[in-house]
Amino acid sequence: MKLKTHDDRLTLTNGSYHALVHARKPKGIENKSAYLIGTGIGALAAGCFLIRDAHMDGSKITFFEQLDLPGGSLDGEVLQNLGYVARGGREMGHHFEVLWGLFSSLPSTEDPNMTVLDHFFYTNYDDPNYSNCRITHKNGERYDNAKFNLGQDLAKELAEFVLIPDEELQDKSIDEIFSEELLNTDFWTLWRTMFAFENWHSALEMKLYMNRFIHHVGGLPTLSALQFSRHDQYTSFVKPMVIFLKELKDFY
């Protein structure tokens, strides 16, 4: 498979031989500048990659941000009369290849002897995420039996759903596509509570989530498929990128 790259000889391959090679400095990079809107994780990561892989001088990178705190929704700060506020945490998984590729080369602010990825990995290795009981009802009684209770017909309905062309799901809600029986299964309860879906949400978004996170299905009943940073994601993820960008340190 050909890649969209300045070098036509590069192709997608198996193994790590090509992935571990440091990128060459592109011709003419000294004459280029980058202007990034916002300081969410996407913009911060782009800045880090421009320095690490494109060898762009940090002085040529400009961020436009209206807020006092970088990180977009990955914020976290002490607010007067409110206490410490962070807008939620993001559920992480093994297959965030681009993110982990970046964090494998950024020093952790929580342990200077580790990279961000090292610290994240060992946090979850030593204290893996696991829920003995995902759902309760009737004032604390266990609700689920750690099974999806789908049956063959409903499992087939899900399989057929992910094969529907995107165009046919435009402007359709989940409850317009899924049967009432499927919406009353434990699978749907487990899925919707993990990914914050409502029945009236976009069917197309549901399909995209299933395509992206289907490998997490086995861990739905126990949340064992998920990993979390030790602290809020501003502290664990945003600060290391901001510090690197400010200090313009060499990655290698």
Task: Identify the role of each PLM range.
Residues 1-34, 52-59:
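Extreme N-terminal leader/targeting segments of oxidoreductases
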Residues 38-41:
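Glycine-rich Rossmann-fold phosphate-binding loop(s) that bind the pyrophosphate
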Residues 45, 49, 98-101, 236, ...:
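Short amphipathic alpha-helical face segments that pack within enzyme cores
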Residues 46-59, 244-250:
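A short, Lys/Arg-enriched amphipathic alpha-helix followed by its capping loop at the start of a domain
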Residues 51-78:
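Glycine-rich FAD pyrophosphate-binding loop
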Residues 54, 68, 74, 96-111, ...:
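A generic secondary-structure signal for well-formed alpha-helical elements
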Residues 81-164:
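Dinucleotide-binding Rossmann-like beta1-alpha1 core, especially the glycine-rich loop
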Residues 156-252:
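Active-site/ligand-binding neighborhood in enzyme catalytic cores
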